[in-house]
Curated annotation (Swiss-Prot):
The modification Phosphoserine is found at S238, S301. This is Protein FAM110B. Residues 127-151, 237-256, 317-337 are annotated as: Disordered. It holds the Pfam family FAM110_C. Belongs to the FAM110 family. Its main location: cytoplasm. It comes from Homo sapiens (Human). Detected in thyroid, spleen and testis, and at lower levels in stomach, spinal cord, lymph node, trachea, adrenal gland, prostate, ovary and intestine. One of its GO terms (cellular component) is mitochondrion. Keywords: Cytoplasm, Cytoskeleton, Phosphoprotein.
């Protein structure tokens, strides 16, 4: 064995149990006694407030004996006093019999409310059934009574009256006359239909009937007469409306009024401009004389005698049917007439083509003169 281990072993001394206890617990705790441990064992040790500490040291800073003897209590918030409860009431509240009685009262009140609601519903159902059944027949049987009651007749009569369309006062055009005839037929059919039918679904059918519209002309229908000119319409009307009616048709402004001479001048100028543009491709008379009228023979055959006018779909259909009927009757005369129905695109293309031909004619004349 080495000598170092022997020396360390000889230096170690045995330790007594008393020495271990004194080293683990300090001496100042042992000197405090058992009261120290009791105070630590208490859950919340009471601490003195500032008032209590001042009360204990009052003799140090107060001279009069009266103040020293007087004890100052801390100010506490006022506690609201509860109303006193009788002991009998306490026992009654605490007993289970009262709770059971309260539950029974609640259930009885709920049952009464439900019964009241059921009675109200029954009354409503009975009243609706009585009003709908009329003379006591049920809806399930679907057998109508032989005679209607006065109330239902009055109601249906008022409903039929509400469907009527009364004519407005004023002048009537010949086209409006046919519509009034259609309205009368509709009224008569509606009245008869209402008196015959009994169910609400039939009445709904009457209300869904739309007003009659003007039936467009088909190929088999007779053609409408052509529209009269403005001058003819103005001559047919009364002399009082003469200065007002043409102005409305021309200027579309009812407040603007023009004299007859001004209107005729405007019509003449418009016709002249249209003729110059479509017949002579917008050229002045001097240019036409220089170029020669023979260059416009083809233009005159295609464009000169065409009647350009705007028309609605109904009038165009009627005119086409009129043309077809007249073609069947007069085949020879149809070949001599100028064809109708050239579109605006084709018309513009012809105008552009003739303008181009005039330009080429000018260039050829310049080349020939040179």
């Amino acid at each position: 064995m080495p000598t170092e281990t022997l020396q360390t072993g000889s230096m170690v001394k045995p330790v007594s149990p008393a020495g271990t206890f004194t080293s683990a617990v300090p001496l100042r705790i042992l000197n405090k006694g058992p009261d120290y441990f009791r105070r630590q064992a208490e859950p919340n040790p009471k601490r003195l407030s500032a008032v209590e500490r001042l009360e204990a040291d009052k003799a140090k800073y107060v001279k009069s004996q009266e103040v020293i003897n007087a004890k100052q209590e801390p100010v506490k918030p006022a506690v609201l006093a509860k109303p006193p409860v009788c002991p009998a009431a306490k026992r009654a509240l605490g007993s289970p019999t009262l709770k059971v009685f309260g539950n029974h009262a609640k259930t009885e009140s709920g049952v009464q409310r439900e019964n009241l609601k059921l009675e109200i519903l029954k009354n409503i159902i009975n009243s609706s059934e009585g009003s709908s059944s009329g003379s006591g027949h049920k809806h399930s049987s679907r057998n109508w009574p032989p005679h209607r009651s006065e109330a239902t007749d009055l109601h249906r009569h008022s409903f039929a009256e509400s469907l009527k369309v009364y004519p407005t006062q004023g002048r009537r055009s010949p086209q409006e006359g046919g519509s009034h005839v259609g309205r009368r037929l509709l009224e008569q059919s509606a009245e008869s239909f209402l008196h015959v039918s009994h169910s609400s679904s039939d009445i709904r059918k009457v209300t869904s009937v739309k007003p009659l519209k003007a039936i467009p002309c088909s190929s088999s229908a007779p053609p409408l007469p052509p529209k009269p000119k403005i001058a003819a319409i103005a001559s047919m009307k009364s002399p009082e409306a003469d200065p007002v009616e043409p102005a409305c048709g021309v200027s579309r402004r009812p407040s603007l009024q023009r004299s007859k001479s001004d209107l005729s001048d405007r019509y003449f100028r418009v016709d002249a401009d249209v003729e110059r543009f479509f017949n002579y491709c917008g050229l002045d008379p001097e240019e036409l004389e220089n170029l020669g009228m023979e260059n416009f023979a083809r233009a005159n055959s295609d464009i000169i005698s065409l009647n350009f006018r705007s028309a609605s779909m109904i009038s165009s259909d009627c005119e086409q049917s009129q043309d077809s009927n007249s073609d069947l009757r007069n085949d020879d005369s149809a070949n001599d007439r100028v064809p109708y129905g050239i579109s605006a695109i084709e018309r513009n293309a012809r105008i552009i083509k003739w303008l181009y031909s005039i330009k080429q004619a000018r260039e050829s004349q310049k080349v020939s003169h040179v």
